């Protein structure tokens, strides 16, 4: 029964992740509720072992239908991986609890900005080309990769917003690009969790399969309904992140 519950949660998480990120809002609470006595690191590692496959398949699906800026995306993904490793190291040196208190406020500002800019991310008009785009994308990958390793919640949303606001992408193309960087940051985290023995591999396969199925459904929905649909899901996910992080910070 436990495997069925977390596999269904993984499927739904894969669907949401494929559209705009935020699947951890679904899968992690399901894992913690189903296995309350497990070590948190093991549940985080098991979550990554499933979600990385859904994100990877979403990247492939998007690349078949959406132009992927590989020239800027590959360096961004590489630096995202390095940034995630650096962030994971930094969390062993500095207590990240101070950042937890600021996160709901940052997400709130991001949401307000998105809502007030009605046309934000509705049309695809990249602002930069060539080396300039490569450097800005690399900076996005490094900074948000570090954040993912150091703290984590909302990484997908921050990536999408950065591509929309800084590079001029629409929400669909931004989500597609964000997937590649997310695969890299997830790979870094999964490597660390694996080396520390914090992955339940007997759970990983069925959860990964379910996540991939959800990912394929989510990608189809995003491609079918376009940037406006992805924008609406983005707003919903950010609002859910605000509620979750505010509760964890101030009420729990």
Where are these regions (language model features)?
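Residues within membrane-spanning alpha-helices of integral membrane proteins
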Residues: 3, 48, 103-107, 111, ...
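Hydrophobic alpha-helical transmembrane segments in multi-pass integral membrane proteins
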Residues: 86, 143-151, 189-197, 204, ...
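Selected transmembrane alpha-helices and immediately adjacent juxtamembrane segments
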Residues: 1-39, 124-175
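Transmembrane helix-loop junction
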Residues: 33-34, 42, 92, 101, ...
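Selective hydrophobic functional segments
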Residues: 45-98, 102, 186-232, 236
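Transmembrane helix exit motif
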Residues: 57-67, 88, 104-129, 242-252
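Alpha-helix N-cap/start motif
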Residues: 39-40, 70, 171, 201
């Amino acid at each position: 029964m436990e495997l069925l519950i977390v596999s269904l949660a993984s499927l739904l998480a894969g669907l949401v992740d494929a559209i705009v990120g935020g699947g951890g809002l679904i899968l992690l609470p399901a894992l913690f509720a189903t296995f309350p006595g497990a070590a948190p690191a093991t549940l985080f590692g098991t979550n990554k072992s499933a979600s990385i496959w859904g994100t990877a398949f979403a990247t492939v699906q998007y690349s078949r239908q959406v132009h992927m800026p590989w020239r800027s995306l590959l360096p961004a993904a590489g630096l995202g991986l390095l940034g995630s490793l650096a962030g994971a190291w930094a969390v062993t040196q500095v207590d990240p609890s101070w950042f937890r208190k600021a996160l709901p406020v940052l997400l709130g500002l991001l949401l307000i900005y998105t809502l007030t800019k009605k046309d934000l991310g509705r049309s695809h008009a990249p602002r930069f080309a060539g080396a300039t785009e490569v450097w800005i994308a690399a900076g996005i990958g490094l900074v948000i990769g570090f954040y993912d390793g150091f703290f984590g919640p909302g990484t997908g949303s921050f990536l999408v917003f950065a591509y929309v606001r800084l590079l001029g992408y629409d929400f669909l193309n931004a989500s597609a690009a964000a997937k590649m960087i997310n695969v890299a940051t997830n790979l870094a985290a999964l490597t660390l969790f694996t080396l520390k023995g914090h992955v339940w591999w007997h759970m990983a396969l069925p959860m990964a399969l379910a996540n991939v199925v959800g990912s394929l459904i989510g990608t189809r929905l995003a491609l079918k309904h376009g940037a406006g649909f992805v924008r609406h899901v983005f707003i919903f996910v950010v609002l859910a992140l605000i509620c979750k992080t505010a509760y964890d910070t101030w009420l729990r």
